Regions:
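C-terminal output helix
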Residues: 113-122
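His-Asp phosphorelay/catalytic-motif detector in bacterial-type signaling
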Residues: 51-53, 79-84
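A short, hydrophobic beta-strand element within the central beta-sheet of small alpha/beta folds
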Residues: 82-92
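Short amphipathic alpha-helix used as the core "switch/output" element in two-component signaling
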Residues: 45, 68-81
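Charged docking surfaces used in two-component/phosphorelay signaling
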Residues: 21-29
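Alpha4 helix (beta4-alpha4-beta5 surface) of REC/receiver domains from two-component response regulators
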Residues: 65-69, 92-109, 120
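Active-site residues of response regulator receiver
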Residues: 58-59, 89
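Helix N-cap/capping motif at the beta->alpha junctions
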Residues: 36-45, 66-67
Length: 127
């Protein structure tokens, strides 16, 4: 039985369709209900509508609202402030880790990543 069988909702936010699709396949196979966004603004819209249990957010997304700013917006919004957020980045780790956590992210994960390590991180954050 997949670990996410309770159909917890996860929103994947990344401008790279390949990353979104890899995460989609990996997490759906674990039983999670997946939503996707390619921009910060779209992520905010989906999060307000769907109320995901977890958001996996790329730190560098286009559309005028980068991942850290989007995280800050979501954490300051009464409708979405309880969503858990894992920041995903291929950039300088320590600097971005601090910025992410300061913005309200619950955890941080580096690219490239192994799907199994990401599943473990998701389970850890969701508790």
């Amino acid at each position: 039985m997949p670990r996410g069988i309770l159909m917890k909702k996860i929103l994947i936010v990344d401008d790279q369709s390949e990353i979104r699709e890899l995460l989609n396949i990996t997490l759906k196979s674990e039983g999670y209900d997946i939503f996707q966004a390619e921009s910060g603004q779209k992520a905010i819209e989906i999060a307000r509508k769907e109320r995901p249990d977890l958001i996996i957010m790329d730190i560098a997304i286009p559309g005028g609202t980068e991942g850290i700013e989007t995280t800050r917006t979501l954490k300051n919004d009464p409708e979405t402030k309880n969503c858990k957020i894992i920041m995903l980045t291929g950039r300088s780790l320590e600097t971005n880790r601090k910025k992410s956590l300061d913005a309200g992210a619950d955890d941080f994960f580096a690219k490239p990543f192994s799907p199994l390590a990401l599943i473990k991180k998701v389970e850890e954050v969701l508790g």
